[in-house]
Amino acid sequence: MRVLVKLSGEALSGEGGRGFDPERVDYIVKEIKSAIEEGFKIGIVVGAGNLFRGVELKNLTMARADQIGLLGTVMNSIYLKDIFERSGLKARIYSQIVNLPDVERVNYDSIESALRENSILIFAGGTSNPFFTTDTAAVLRAQEMRAKLVVKATKVDGVYDKDPKKFPDAKKIPHLTFSEAMKMGLKVMDAEAFALCKKLGITVKVINFFEPGTLLKALKGEDVGSTVVPD
């Protein structure tokens, strides 16, 4: 089974949400390695929030601020590749926005070859264009690696009818459609990502990635997190 895991940049950072935290990164490696060992084919899209925040770039034009963010995802991807390989895993980076020795152009034959050798695919540079989020990039790259599942790795154990951090009475919604999520105004993903999921028939699983073993449970179809399906 092929799956695209969407990681925020903050997932790589520790207290304060900046930079790289060795313990946090080791945890990510352990969770991904468990999935690889069970035979799952893994792709990753990572954000850049640990390096750059939108508020810090607010004085720039949106296009240039987005370009800085896209380059941040390349930096995070190179970091992840090195850590994965030091842990005995194979990893390859794909991006359309930079020309670096460790970064390949997106090529379907190369992607298929990498998956056959159980390499982790790390997609950097978003969609290659400004104005699109890494949520949209995750869905696009899932389609390119022929995955029908995107796992959104968060700090919350699923989708709620309102923010559980602010409202103690928030109710978890285990299963819903993209149309229902949009109608309820739930910020699972942005509208462009939702529309692409519906068009391509891709399911999104929202999990608390930082509960040990949850990723593997989600991939095995166990009842964790929330599942958002095309309608």
Would you name each region that the model predicts?
Residues 1-231:
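C-terminal catalytic "cap/lid" subdomain
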